[in-house]
A protein has these predicted regions:
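S-adenosyl-L-methionine
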Residues: 2-528
């Protein structure tokens, strides 16, 4: 049933001689853990299409009564998956590859490279490009590099359907490995190919040493992806002149940043999945302050998702006007906020979920955070279709989904976060992000290894140039009044009025939001 296979028992004469001289393969790229929605697809549509993990679990448990045969099949598949994972994790045979969210392709790569290959042999395998760029494969890939075993890595995007049954955005690579007694001091790379003809383009091929990789990714030692030789030269120059955001090898964290993913859209769905616009209205809550529901002393706050904001814009997308049947589907799309809505300082976007204020306060206490505004960014992007890959902004401090994680600064002053906002939004930072992304996920481990200017770089003259432009771009609505008040408390009325003679502090001590003017905003962003 399980087709157990032992290499040494099957090929004793090969391993008596040290292993195979040549190993070629195209191993499967599958998660070991069962994906509920995928497994039930075609078996139970209600479970397969449910977007709520809480609801899915209930539907699965109900099968015990409604469809015990399917329920028993599910339990057997679940047990098989769990035992496979247990073997991979506990056997000691796959310590480099059985890490994190288990996938079969690094397991097979580990087998081909370190377990069945002769020390003077060669291996060529087709695997996902994530073997060189993903977080959970970092130990496997860095060991290959440290032992001078990587000959070449040629990356492909499947846009021309080299593999017809694989989605176009999928990336895979041809990985060539030498045995441990056949060292390769330099490795050849070529990324972002769409067909085999592009491999003959010399400008797209470049070499990297393990020292180059360690400079760019000191924490994980996984591989940067350059389009061409020029990209490589530019990036190496940047990293030689700038530190990374958080270098774990020496403990340097110039911006004193901590990362938080407040509420996981699947695992924390119990906090918000039932709290929809229609449900809260039906329960007697009233929408006030644009997007906050209240009933007496009880309040529900918007659950902030990545699709609601963009650079210097916390009112980018809204679910206002999106019918309920389209609001909760997979990859539900928002409506873009109109120019008229952006011009209105009282306008707030409408989310699709709300979260109880008390649950949010509990999470903020865990984070030890008390400000009424926060810096959040999108951790999912698309480098082939999106104009910008690094998208983050100062937003009202609302509950944030795991797809819009938050950065908390040791120096919590508004001025400090303003400077970081300008750095994060810069073209050169975005360029470095694009080079660092191996897929759509802009994860914390990637952000930690991006080059930054330390806060000490910012002279009074630079601050005087940057700060007023970031403030004007950011403070466009009354829901960010706490941010403006914190800025005012730090710089004083005289400095505010000197920066913004056309928008001075009012008699009530509160500056008004800046008028949304597309041409003016374009000029300010060009300045920055």
């Amino acid at each position: 049933e399980h087709r157990f296979f032992h290499w040494h028992l099957e090929f004793p004469e090969v391993f008596a001689d040290g292993g195979f001289d040549c190993v070629l393969g195209n191993p499967p790229w599958e998660k070991v853990k069962i994906i509920e929605k995928k497994w039930f697809n075609g078996k139970n549509d209600d479970i397969a299409t449910s977007t709520s993990k809480t609801k899915r679990n209930k539907l699965i448990n109900d099968l015990n009564v409604s469809n015990p045969c399917l329920y028993n099949q599910w339990k057997a598949a679940l047990k098989d998956s769990e035992l496979t994972a247990k073997y991979l994790l506990k056997s000691g045979s796959f310590s480099l590859s059985a890490v994190g969210d288990l996938n079969t392709y690094p397991i097979f790569a580990d087998l081909c490279i370190f377990q069945i290959l002769h020390p003077e042999g060669m291996s060529g395998i087709v695997v996902k490009t994530g073997i060189a760029t993903d977080y959970f494969t970092k130990d496997l890939f860095s060991t290959i590099l440290e032992n001078d075993m990587l000959v070449s890595l040629y990356d492909f995007i499947n846009s021309e359907r080299i593999f017809p049954d694989i989605a176009p955005p999928e990336r895979f690579c041809l990985l060539t490995i030498s045995g441990s007694r056949r060292p390769s001091k330099e490795s050849t790379f070529s990324y972002f190919n769409t067909n085999f003809r592009s491999l003959s383009d010399a400008s797209r091929k470049y070499t990297l040493t393990k020292e180059d990789v360690n400079l760019i990714n000191p924490n994980t030692k996984n591989c940067p992806a350059f389009h061409n030789i020029r990209d490589k030269k530019i990036i190496l120059s940047i990293y030689r002149n700038c530190p990374v955001l958080l270098d774990e090898t020496c403990g340097k964290n110039f911006w004193s940043i901590k990362y938080y993913a407040m509420f996981h859209m699947a695992n924390d769905s119990k906090f918000f999945s039932e709290n929809t616009y229609e449900k809260l209205l039906n329960d007697g809550y009233t929408l006030i302050s644009g997007n906050i529901f209240r009933r007496n002393a009880d309040a529900f706050l918007p659950l902030w998702e990545a699709k609601y904001f963009h650079l210097y814009n916390h009112r980018f997308g809204t679910f206002e006007g999106v019918p309920i049947e389209r609001r909760f589907i997979k990859k539900a799309g928002t409506e873009k906020v109109t120019l008229e809505q952006k011009i209105a300082p009282d306008y707030s976007i409408l989310p699709r979920y709300w979260l109880n204020h008390k649950d949010f306060i509990d999470r903020l206490e865990e984070m030890e955070y008390s400000q009424k505004w926060i810096f959040t960014f999108r951790d999912v992007t698309n480098t082939t279709t999106n104009a910008r890959s690094a998208v983050g902004t100062i937003s009202p401090c609302y509950p944030c989904s795991d797809k819009s994680p938050c950065l908390i600064f040791g120096d919590t002053s508004a001025n400090n976060v303003i400077l970081f906002q300008s750095l994060f939004s810069s073209i050169i930072f975005d360029y470095c992000v694009r080079i660092s992304l191996g897929g759509a996920k802009f994860a914390w481990y990637i952000l930690k290894q991006l080059p930054v200017l330390p806060p000490s770089t910012y002279t009074p003259a630079l601050i005087d140039f940057i700060a007023p432009r970031v403030i004007e771009l950011t403070y466009t609505a009354w829901d960010l009044e706490p941010f403006a008040r914190d800025v005012l408390a730090e710089v004083g009325v005289a400095q505010w009025n000197a920066w913004f003679p056309a928008n001075p502090v009012g008699d009530d001590g509160t500056p008004r939001p800046f008028v949304w003017d597309e041409e003016r905003r374009f000029d300010l962003r060009c300045d920055l």
